[in-house]
């Protein structure tokens, strides 16, 4: 692993850790100030307006690959044209679509909320659309920083934006409620857009101060790449947003609120691991041009590291579900704990498709990623409605988990077959002890869930200390620990 790749991976992980802390502080504050039902309204409205991302045309995601490729070829002027072309196109296309979507989304909301919560949802809808427009623009600059392999700049930018959101929420929410939170998001989007371009000019000096270098040839190439990504976006809209909408319909805004919190806990833990892996996208784009034979070895290495890190991390999440409920909701909530446990299992299976997913992005084989999202989206929408009609919010959650795992398994199987890796693809007997330890911890968390506010001190101490002790011992005797330590020591010696 090169020094730059390691630096980018560390920057991604630190950004995710800091961002998770800021997000959880925001959730705790909203829960305390407004309540879980208003958190659910906010979550569902944001998921609903994400339909506007169809106007993105896959450009914001494609920026990473094209900037990385053009820099690898020494075409820095063209890399700056990629940024401006994507930026100007999205400012116009998304800006034109948003006013048209507003009346359509306003007609959808009555099917999701009752009278009281409907008024709140309709009130924040326009603000959510403006916030999304700013966020999409900011995503172009963040993708440019990733393509320049300056992820430490992007990480600092995103964390600063999240801190700004929290500060504005503390200021505006007590005065204006959910509308104050919406204004805080607009302030965050404006900050990310302006500061993002300024930082990108440091990494790409050919970029002018203001976007003005639009190029049809660049756009045509990006649209060709973005077609598969855009299809992916379409089916992603049948995943998370549809799940939240179905939860609001069949379980009410409180169910959507608990799902939002539980899902974010798992996603932030997943992101700590996966964002380190995301650093390989520009690296893979370079390898695809220079040393394509190294891609399979890089994939195997990624999978082995993921198994070593993911299994104990997600087992610990499962065992500590009650502690997260107390942290975010202020008390032990059975609904939250159930959803967190289910999502830990689902996202824990999904995380192993990350090496295949990001390698495909780097090499341009994004069609297989699209297939995975098609499967997830179609299963989630169809099963979610069916199981939600029968079993309410729990049925929707189970459909979400089934869709997530199924789509991930298909992507892994196809990637390993294409590269002749077989079903193991990096898995080995060395992980057996770790798997057993994780199974013990999960069983312990299921039998004796952690209840910080009601458990006896001895039981609470056992619930907090035994899981990390068991997992830590298994990780200590795992051969991957020595290999990771060797990589770190070798890198330290080089620097």
Residue ranges and their predicted role:
Residues 57-73, 87, 101, 146-147, ...:
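Helix-loop junctions and terminal segments of transmembrane helices
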Residues 15, 19-23, 45-49, 53, ...:
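Short runs within selected transmembrane alpha-helices of multi-pass transporters and secretion channels
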Residues 14, 88-241:
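Hydrophobic transmembrane helix module of multi-pass membrane transport proteins
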Residues 1-23, 77-85, 118-122, 213-232, ...:
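N-terminal membrane topogenesis motif
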Residues 1-5, 196-240, 279, 283-297, ...:
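Interhelical loop/hinge segments that connect adjacent transmembrane helices in multipass membrane
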Residues 444-495:
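Membrane-proximal transmembrane or re-entrant/amphipathic helices at the cytosolic face
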Residues 30-50, 122, 179-183, 217-229, ...:
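Interfacial/gating helices of multi-pass transporter permease domains
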Residues 105-128, 317-354:
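Interfacial segments at transmembrane-helix termini and the short loops linking adjacent helices
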């Amino acid at each position: 692993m090169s020094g730059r790749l390691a630096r980018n991976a560390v920057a991604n992980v630190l950004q995710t850790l800091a961002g998770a802390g800021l997000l959880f502080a925001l959730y705790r504050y909203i829960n305390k100030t407004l309540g879980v039902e208003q958190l659910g309204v906010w979550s569902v409205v944001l998921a609903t307006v994400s339909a506007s991302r169809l106007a993105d045309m896959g450009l914001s995601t494609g920026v990473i690959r094209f900037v990385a490729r053009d820099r690898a070829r020494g075409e820095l002027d063209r890399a700056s044209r990629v940024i401006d072309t994507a930026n100007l196109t999205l400012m116009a296309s998304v800006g034109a679509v948003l006013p048209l979507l507003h009346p359509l989304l306003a007609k959808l909301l009555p099917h999701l909320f009752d009278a009281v919560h409907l008024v709140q949802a309709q009130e924040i809808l326009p603000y959510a659309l403006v916030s999304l427009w700013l966020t999409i623009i900011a995503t172009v600059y963040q993708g440019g920083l990733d393509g320049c392999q300056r992820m430490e700049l992007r990480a600092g930018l995103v964390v600063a934006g999240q801190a700004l959101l929290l500060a504005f929420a503390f200021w505006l929410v007590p005065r204006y409620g959910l509308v104050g939170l919406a204004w805080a998001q607009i302030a965050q989007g404006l900050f990310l857009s302006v500061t993002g371009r300024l930082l990108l000019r440091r990494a790409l000096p050919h970029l002018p101060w203001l976007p003005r270098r639009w190029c049809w040839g660049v756009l045509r190439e990006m649209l060709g790449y973005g077609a598969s990504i855009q299809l992916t976006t379409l089916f992603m809209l049948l995943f998370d947003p549809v799940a939240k909408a179905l939860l609001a319909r069949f379980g009410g805004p409180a169910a959507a609120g608990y799902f939002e919190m539980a899902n974010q806990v798992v996603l932030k833990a997943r992101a700590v691991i996966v964002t380190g892996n995301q650093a390989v996208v520009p690296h893979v784009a370079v390898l695809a041009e220079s040393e394509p034979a190294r891609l399979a070895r890089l994939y195997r290495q990624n999978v082995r590291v993921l198994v070593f890190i993911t299994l104990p991390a997600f087992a610990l999440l499962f065992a500590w579900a009650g502690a997260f409920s107390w942290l975010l909701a202020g008390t032990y909530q059975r609904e939250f704990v159930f959803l967190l446990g289910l999502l830990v299992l689902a996202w824990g299976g999904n995380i192993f498709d990350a090496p295949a997913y990001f390698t495909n992005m780097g090499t341009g084989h994004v069609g297989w990623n699209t297939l995975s999202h098609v499967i997830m989206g179609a299963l989630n929408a169809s099963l979610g409605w069916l199981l939600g009609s029968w079993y309410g919010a729990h049925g929707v959650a189970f459909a979400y988990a089934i869709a997530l795992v199924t789509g991930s398994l298909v992507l892994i199987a196809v990637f390993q077959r294409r590269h002749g890796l077989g079903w193991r693809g990096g898995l080995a007997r060395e992980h057996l002890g770790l798997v057993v330890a994780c199974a013990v911890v999960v069983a312990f968390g299921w039998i004796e869930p952690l209840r910080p506010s009601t458990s006896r001190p001895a039981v609470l101490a056992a619930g907090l200390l035994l899981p990390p002790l068991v997992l830590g011992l298994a990780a200590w005797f795992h051969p991957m620990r020595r290999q990771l330590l060797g990589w770190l020591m070798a890198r330290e010696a080089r620097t």
